[in-house]
Amino acid sequence: MTSTFVFKDIDAVLFDLDGTLIDSAPDLGAAADKMRIDRGMASLPLADYRPMAGAGARGMIAVAFGLTPEHPRFEALKEEFFSNYEERLTAMTYAFDGVAELIASIVGAGLKWGVVTNKSARFTLPLTQAMPLFETAYVIVSGDTTPHAKPHPAPLLEAARQLEMVPQRCMYVGDDERDIVAGRAAGMPTVAAAYGYLGVSVDTAAWKADAIITAPGLLLNFLRMP
């Protein structure tokens, strides 16, 4: 998408994590696929897991076993998945092309940045500590930092509180409709990352974000840079 305007008075950029800054689908998929292999089932290709990576354990178990959270086996499978994933958090996880350069530009412009994710702190903290990309992040809010996860605005409002900024001066970027819903409810300008897990198969324009980007670096078109 080509920029026709810039967001004014933005002092911080907040991002969703999986599918927006990093591609964790290979590790999420591998953690779920190990469960199949351990049971003598055929391995599934990453392409089967990738579209559901944004849904975490729920999505991975749905692909691997066709089960929903209502199934009596789901909780046990979820804990097994978590254990597998914990052992390989960053084995094959990487930042999307252009993300490192985007963050460097944001920092260089004197803006603050951070992460607001539905991923629990059990995984968010060791993952972000293991990846140099996050060394300059001012705030990291996990899915269990506040009593409510996205699409509730509470996590985004908590990030703004920690940054000591009003929400209106914080932009939120995410690759799922719940990100846009949460950002709008928090009073933040929103940007849909159409390059994420859902962007190819979903009409991101229907989310009614303030802007849409098809690559990380295009976000700079919407920021007032020095």
Give a label for each model feature:
Residues 62-104, 109:
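Metal-dependent phosphoesterase signature
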Residues 1-12, 47, 107, 120-121, ...:
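Asp-based, Mg2+/Mn2+-dependent phosphohydrolase catalytic module
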Residues 37-42, 68-70, 109, 132-136, ...:
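Short helix-capping segments at alpha-helix termini
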Residues 20, 32, 99-129:
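Substrate-recognition element of Asp-dependent hydrolases with the DxDx(T/V) motif
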Residues 28, 53-57, 77-85, 120:
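Hydrophobic/aromatic residues within well-ordered alpha-helical segments
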Residues 42, 112, 189:
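Residue-level detector of anion-binding/catalytic polar loops
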